[in-house]
Amino acid sequence: MCIFAAMNENILPIHFAPLQGYTDAVYRRAHARIFGGIETYYSPFVRMEHGEIRRKDARDIEPDNNPDLHLIPQLIAPDADKLEHIMSLFIEKGYQEADINLGCPFPMLARRHNGCGMLPYPEEVKALLSEAIDRQPDVRSSVKLRLGWEHAEECLALQPLFNELPLAHIT
């Protein structure tokens, strides 16, 4: 029995957020075995580099590397074509869920309109998310969000969009 289940069966489910460079498949397996109690793990984001999906990222989400875990792979992309390419990998690996990262503040990525660097541009966010959902309607999409890149209220401009899209959730 996991330590959390013994505390209270009526508690909310726990979702394990990723930390780039730390919470890889080995960490997730060890955490699940030692602590348990996590309903869903999220992978660090999968991204494209030099026109290809990074091999390290693809290995990390391999189902064989994540046995007995409910893993939702996360991706980061500045446009719908790259996003679709990454989502196709998720589908190929058997995943039916994807988390789209609009929260990463890492300057090298954000300056290229990845992660929260896209938040000041609501039309780009709309194009990215709408295309993702239209192109992959069988994938349950969610969004990882930050308040903003330049201003905390940037996320508020996106609220109408989020309300009209069939997102599984926003974190």
Regions found by a protein language model. Name each.
Residues 11-13, 37-38, 67-70, 138-140, ...:
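A generic structural signal for alpha->beta connector loops
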Residues 30, 87-98, 102, 106-108, ...:
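Alpha/beta enzyme core
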